[in-house]
Amino acid sequence: MSAPKITFIGAGSTVFVKNILGDVFQRPALKSAHIALMDIDETRLEESHIVVRKLMDSVGANGEISYHRDRKTALQGADFVVVAFQIGGYEPCTVTDFAVCKRHGLEQTIADTLGPGGIMRALRTIPHLWAICDDMTEVCPDATMLNYVNPMAMNTWAMYARYPHIKQVGLCHSVQGTAEELARDLDLDPADLRYRCAGINHMAFYLSLEKKLADGSYVSIYPDLLQAYADGRAPKPNLHGNPRCENIVRYEMLKKLGYFVTESSEHFAEYTPWFIKPGRDDLLARYKVPLDEYPKRCVEQLANWHQELESYKRGERIEVKPSREYASTIMNAIWTGEPSVVYGNVRNDNLIDNLPQGCCVEVACLVDANGIQPTKVGALPAHLAALMQTNINVQTLLTQAILTENRDYVYYATMMDPHTAAVLGIEEIYALVDDLIASHGDWLPAWLHR
């Protein structure tokens, strides 16, 4: 069997590329793949090239490696396209999203999925994703795009809307990652869990979540989670080595809703109107909500990356540990025909009955030589669907804004955001949007400045 060509757009995300390729090179069918790295930042691209070459030597991978600053050249003849970039980066754009919102009285935690921060990020990002789709249509029309770029739902929706012929799936690690976290909270082996999960990106819920018993049968762990939370045994501290994020919000939502949500407490806190309010420091303290978490995380990650890069340069080998990312599983399944199941973000074509048709949903997908095949869920519990709809409203209006180049719909999307609407009045929301658009300047599409 011939080897595939795997193109990374945003290869300057070196740690992410290392994790994905560490998985890829453990797959016999992918070990000889041609790896094409593409990034506009020449320094970061060279850093990634050094790390990937050393990674290949460490695991005995023998494929070709090439690196490019021209996107179309990198995409030529690709079988798989992995997309992972952040338009505008931490500086200036993330800093702008947080500073401007704070100036208008709106606090945020992550700001990459919903709210004014997520909306601005979508407006910055979608034109670049469309440009990739243009190039793929020309030079690798049969390739499968594995998209890791946030805001996932809006990005995926916008690409489906304009480029329905592109094979693509939006990928996140929150479904499998949260399952591992909950296993840790209960001192279980994650391999003993099975679950069924569905919803929208960053707001999917485990409709069933079970552990395997000694006799081979399965039983729900929801009673165990609730009891562990009541006893103070869960959540366990220092999740992912970050003492600021204590995961209280999601356990409280489990108590209220009866189901556990996939994305982190710091994310979920800003998707709803309940946790972040002016003058309510008591709520922040009670639910351990870490304001400005993403900027802090960016600063720490940048510092850590410089240390990691130096260690990679000095060492003869790079240790390869399996990641929780789905990318290599998907590539292997499509390339070899060996079936697998992943959770992906796809168009809602009769998959979830009580969410809007055509929106972006996160469901289990069968993957084999026929590609990515989403599975039908049916109807979600009504209260979960209602909660998701509040987020889908924002996604719908933002997608409409960028498809029609209509600035009014940017205002509408921001007005409908649950957190923003709970804090600001209508005129304040319009003023905030105007300030964000002006502050971001040319990072945003030209039609927003007409």
Show where each model-derived region lies.
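N-terminal Rossmann-like dinucleotide-binding module
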Residues: 6-31, 35
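Rossmann-fold NAD(P)-binding glycine/threonine-rich loop
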Residues: 91-162
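Short acidic low-complexity segments
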Residues: 64-77
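Internal, well-ordered domain-core segments that constitute the primary functional module
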Residues: 132-213
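Conserved NAD(P)H cofactor-binding loop of Rossmann-fold oxidoreductase domains
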Residues: 85-88
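Long, compositionally biased stretches enriched for glycine and/or charged residues
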Residues: 187-450
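Redox-cofactor binding/interface segments in oxidoreductases and associated redox assembly factors
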Residues: 76, 82-83, 147-148
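NAD(P)-binding Rossmann-fold cofactor-contacting core
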Residues: 29-53
